[in-house]
Design a protein with these regions (language model features):
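N-terminal compositionally biased, intrinsically disordered segments and leader/signal-like regions
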Residues: 3-4, 21, 32, 124
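N-terminal functional modules and adjacent low-complexity/disordered segments of proteins
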Residues: 1-3, 9, 29, 101, ...
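N-terminal mitochondrial targeting presequences
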Residues: 13-14, 29-35
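Short, intrinsically disordered, low-complexity terminal segments
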Residues: 8-10, 25, 30, 327
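Basic polycationic patches enriched in arginine
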Residues: 21-27, 127
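N-terminal chloroplast transit peptides
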Residues: 2-20
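Small-residue-enriched flexible segments
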Residues: 34-72, 77-85, 91-450, 455-500
Length: 500
């Protein structure tokens, strides 16, 4: 019975039912400017007009910059513009000029202007099979970084091997000695994403990393750097440095815990939970199901998720998953999908036939273990989680409150000027039934004054919870993870001159 229950929880992967689609009208351009930043958006179907419209205020912002100022220029286009991304990147690079480090990419929708979310208007199936259903939209986020800042860009095409993970000096030559933050963009077919994440975490431990995966466009390239379209499957890293530059990262995984905290007592391989508190995982899940509310039980059947954290982290505070009883202590769970069941070998016995010399092996297979999309170690803590719109809203609210507290306790005085928002393509209308939920919540938490831009990603890259600058945080929380159904916010600001 418990094995059947576990199979049901795995099989019913959580995919929110899309709301009824409504006819789309072209929206008025949305723009927002604050100090040295500009964000704009356009839904014009003509990519040339869309780039001009979204960049309407860029020239005014850049006119206030000195020749040696570093300029970060990001352009996001929905799948409706996928066939023109090379031309869009080139036109955008011309709009922002030679001083800027420009990136243009394809997402499942865009965030921009006054914090508006413009999704592509298609279901998940249509995104994969019929790009003509996607309503074109485009947004830009352009900023002049604080004095003394610099931007180093590196790109790794499938046939261009990045430095080995253990070669610190090679990575420092590429990205600088001590970047404040790195923006990481990659295509779903990227060959070097894992190595890039591992190297950034290993060699720049105080550097915040945020980014996302683009949405595939029939196998074609989806990212440009400085107006040039590189081969499909590339990974891009932008390293931002500067004494007055302040960059924070917040990641909300949109989940709620269900049941008690347990211990992983045995693993098989590196990604299989073989025992939880000395029992098969199916037995533990059955116990959680019996103690859950009707709503939690329904969500567990749709798709149970697993939250993991090192045992030592249970005594550390800071962001994580929303607790239904309002408890905000140490909820730093890395939430991962259950990707299958694996028979767990408990005992193995070998012997040989003296006459024939044949070697025999007998194995006793116990109950199936849980295969999860993360490395698991014996001693890790584990807790089952569920995901729905309520959990997603509550978790984002919790993470932003955590961010405000950690920012205040860090003691550094700085402004908040812009925010790069990267939600999953499975959020937005598909999850909440309306557009703009994540962006409105983030914008309000940042005081409503930040320039906002971003894109709907096919995988979100960031920490666990909120990481404020180089402030102390558990290593596993600072580590760069690829999330699902998450929203990542990268907050840009300028430190007070006295903080230099």
């Amino acid at each position: 019975m418990t094995s059947l229950l576990l199979l049901l929880c795995i099989a019913h992967a959580f995919v929110p039912s899309p709301p009824t689609r409504q006819p789309r009208r072209r929206r008025a351009p949305q723009t927002h400017a604050i100090r040295n930043w500009w964000s704009g958006a356009s839904s014009d179907r003509d990519w040339r007009a869309a780039v001009r419209e979204a960049c309407a205020g860029v020239a005014a912002v850049l006119s206030e910059a000195d020749d040696d100022d570093a300029v970060l220029a990001l352009c996001f286009a929905s799948l409706g513009h996928a066939q023109s991304i090379g031309s869009i990147g080139e036109a955008f690079d011309e709009e922002v000029g030679d001083r800027a480090t420009s990136v243009a990419l394809i997402g499942g929708g865009v965030v921009g202007g006054a914090g508006d979310e413009r999704e592509d208007g298609a279901t998940n199936e249509q995104r994969q099979t019929d790009n003509s259903e996607a309503a074109p939209s485009l947004s830009v986020l352009v900023g002049v970084l604080p004095k003394g800042s610099s931007i180093e860009a590196a790109s790794f095409a499938p046939d261009k091997t990045p430095p080995p993970k253990n070669k610190a000096e090679r990575w420092q030559e590429l990205l600088g000695a001590s970047p404040r933050a790195c923006l990481l963009f990659a295509e779903p077919s990227s060959r070097w994403l894992g190595r890039s994440c591992g190297a950034l975490d290993a060699h720049f431990p105080d550097c915040g990393v945020g980014g996302g995966l683009t949405c595939a466009a029939g196998g074609a390239s989806t990212i440009t750097l400085r107006g040039s379209l590189l081969p499909a499957g590339a990974t891009y890293v932008l390293a931002l440095s500067g004494p007055r530059l302040r960059v924070d990262c917040v990641a909300s995984q949109g989940c709620a815990p269900v049941g008690d905290v347990y211990e992983v007592t045995r693993t098989a391989r590196s990604q299989v939970v073989a025992e939880i508190d000395g029992r098969p995982p199916a037995v533990t899940l059955d116990k959680v199901m019996r103690g859950a509310t009707d709503r939690e039980r329904e969500l567990l059947k749709r798709g149970a998720l697993v939250g993991l954290r090192p045992a030592a982290a249970s005594r550390l505070s800071g962001g994580g998953a929303y607790s239904k009883d309002g408890d905000e202590e140490a909820a730093d769970w890395l939430v991962r999908q259950i990707i299958g069941q694996v028979p767990s070998v408990r005992e193995q016995m070998s012997w040989s036939n003296r006459m024939s010399g044949i070697q025999y092996t007998a194995r006793r297979v116990s109950d199936a273990g849980l295969a999860v999309d993360a490395e698991v170690r014996a001693g890790d803590e584990v807790r089952f989680h569920v995901r729905d719109a309520t959990a997603a809203n509550n978790d984002l609210d919790l993470q932003l409150r955590r961010y405000a507290l950690e920012r205040a306790y860090s003691g550094a005085a700085s402004s908040i000027e812009a925010c790069l928002v990267i939600p999953c393509v499975g959020r937005g209308q598909l999850l909440f039934g309306e557009s703009g939920s994540d962006t409105r919540t983030i914008g309000a938490a940042l005081g409503g004054q930040a320039a906002v831009g971003g894109f709907f990603a096919n995988g979100e890259l960031g920490p666990v919870g909120a990481v404020v600058g180089s402030a102390a945080a558990p290593v596993y929380r600072r580590r760069t993870h690829q999330h699902d159904y998450a929203v990542v916010a990268v907050v840009f600001g300028e430190a007070d001159p006295d903080e230099e």
